[in-house]
Amino acid sequence: TPSLENGSYDVSNVDDVVSDILKYGWDKDLSNKSLVIGCTTNPGDCDFFQDRLSETGINVFYNPEFIAQGSIIKDLQNADMVLLGGDGKHKGNLVNIYKKIQYGYKEPSIHLMSTKAAEITKIAVNCFLTTKISYANMIGQVLAQSNLYDEIETVLSSIGSDSRIGHKYMNFGFGFGGPCFPR
């Protein structure tokens, strides 16, 4: 999801889809339909879209992806968790779909909550990961400034060996980036 100048998420593409549904969908029975939003949104955006679609009977759900550029398919097939935010009557159907496809090779944990709680959870996960990347780079810089270049990997691996911390994202080098992590 691209950012606006103020740092918030640009959800104009989703807004365009909602506008198209309102423009072209009135002659159809949409009461058994759901709109599942997968991009990162600002807390409250999904509620706003649900309000706009309230007269159509469409249920809005929030199901953000946890993917990285360069490993999108692998990340989707091996998801650790699925967030599903929404209060609509079709939530159970969506959960059953996820259980059937299981995203690939392992069954992710599925977390059901309101759309706003899911929006906040997605942002919180992204913030935690960027903090972890920054922390690993800070430790690497301290070691480099102490002329301990050859021990950076050993130190970060040792820190990551603590199960409360883990090895993922405990690497010295490039910082975070891409469309999801600059905020």
Predicted regions and their residues:
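Structural/interface elements that position substrates and couple domains in central-metabolism enzymes
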Residues: 1-183
